[in-house]
Amino acid sequence: MGFVKVVKNKAYFKRYQVRFRRRREGKTDYYARKRLVIQDKNKYNTPKYRMIVRVTNRDIICQIAYARIEGDMIVCAAYAHELPKYGVKVGLTNYAAAYCTGLLLARRLLNRFGMDKIYEGQVEVNGGEYNVESIDGQPGAFTCYLDAGLARTTTGNKVFGALKGAVDGGLSIPHSTKRFPGYDSESKEFNAEVHRKHIMGQNVADYMRYLMEEDEDAYKKQFSQYIKNNVTPDMMEEMYKKAHAAIRENPVYEKKPKREVKKKRWNRPKMSLAQKKDRVAQKKASFLRAQERAAES
């Protein structure tokens, strides 16, 4: 069949149906969302949980959510901008920070449901394959599915760093090692040590050392915040180890104190009857004084 030009006549415009708003804005992949949201019909009121990961220019957002007609309900959330509290003050959007954010989300969620002592996850980080399995006689492992949004799911993407952090934190998320750093597509083999290096920020540390030797100015420009916070390449692994331990120790979100806002009034308030009478009396007195002065002169 040859090329057929779309005739945009009256019938075309009369029958035209716009796409969903979030599709028009390029924010939601509804093909993927349909498959992530629709639950098995024999599970009735059981929600299907998603682990949502979004990477922005300055932050990494991780959420556990489920869909309702009114909109998505957020069960738990963790953000990379919370990491300075746990000792990671720089590089809040790299792979290591994504892992920490995923770990924080998992520990926070399990703590909220009282399952943090039952499902400890992978305490010793080795970068290898790990899957959470339900324990007999205990509540089942919390299962959810990765929602990567419109991110390109290539090998080594930060989205999978957050996934690995959540799995090591004790959540059951179906996954394979094919998208983790260290997987070789040609030999079909996964090198866990390479993955561990990324989790511990050693790829960043190696680049820091390289720039130090090759181009001092580029190093100062690229890693200005690291220099400001006295973070050296040799300190990186220890910094992330301490952060992982601190997250496991206290993952609870601390609410910020509510800021008291003093209301300002820009227009004049209405005068009461007593104030109006007093104002009239003052004007009368002022007028009489002016009359007296005029008579005297």
Swiss-Prot record:
CDD domains registered for this protein in UniProt: Ribosomal_L18_L5e (cd00432)
Glycyl lysine isopeptide (Lys-Gly) (interchain with G-Cter in SUMO2) crosslink location in chain: 220
Location of Phosphoserine modifications: 185, 272
Compositional bias (Basic residues): 258-268
GO biological process, one term: translation at presynapse
GO function terms (MF aspect): 5S rRNA binding; structural constituent of ribosome
Locations listed in the record: Cytoplasm; Nucleus, Nucleolus
Gene3D superfamilies the record matches: 3.30.420.100
Cross-linked sites for Glycyl lysine isopeptide (Lys-Gly) (interchain with G-Cter in SUMO1): 220
GO cellular component entries: cytoplasm; cytosol; cytosolic large ribosomal subunit; nucleolus; postsynapse; presynapse; ribonucleoprotein complex; ribosome
Residue runs in coiled coils: none
UniProt keyword terms in alphabetical order: Acetylation, Cytoplasm, Isopeptide bond, Nucleus, Phosphoprotein, Ribonucleoprotein, Ribosomal protein, RNA-binding, rRNA-binding, Ubl conjugation
Post-translational modification N6-acetyllysine, affected residues: 5, 48, 220
Region described as Disordered: spans on this chain: 253-297
One protein family per Pfam: Ribosomal_L18_c
Modified residues (N-acetylglycine): 2
Modified residues (Phosphothreonine): 232
Disulfide bonds: none
Entry-linked InterPro entries: Rbsml_uL18_euk (IPR005485), Ribosomal_uL18_C_euk (IPR025607)
Function statement: Component of the ribosome, a large ribonucleoprotein complex responsible for the synthesis of proteins in the cell. The small ribosomal subunit (SSU) binds messenger RNAs (mRNAs) and translates the encoded message by selecting cognate aminoacyl-transfer RNA (tRNA) molecules. The large subunit (LSU) contains the ribosomal catalytic site termed the peptidyl transferase center (PTC), which catalyzes the formation of peptide bonds, thereby polymerizing the amino acids delivered by tRNAs into a polypeptide chain.
Cross-referenced HAMAP family: Ribosomal_uL18_A
Subunit structure as annotated in this protein's UniProt entry: Component of the large ribosomal subunit (LSU). Part of the 5S RNP complex, which is a LSU subcomplex composed of the 5S RNA, RPL5 and RPL11. Component of a hexameric 5S RNP precursor complex, composed of 5S RNA, RRS1, RPF2/BXDC1, RPL5, RPL11 and HEATR3; this complex acts as a precursor for ribosome assembly. Interacts with NVL in an ATP-dependent manner. Interacts with RRP1B. Interacts with IPO5, IPO7 and KPNB1; these interactions may be involved in RPL5 nuclear import for the assembly of ribosomal subunits.
Family: Belongs to the universal ribosomal protein uL18 family.
UniProt protein name: Large ribosomal subunit protein uL18
Native organism taxonomy: Eukaryota, Metazoa, Chordata, Craniata, Vertebrata
Gene: Rpl5
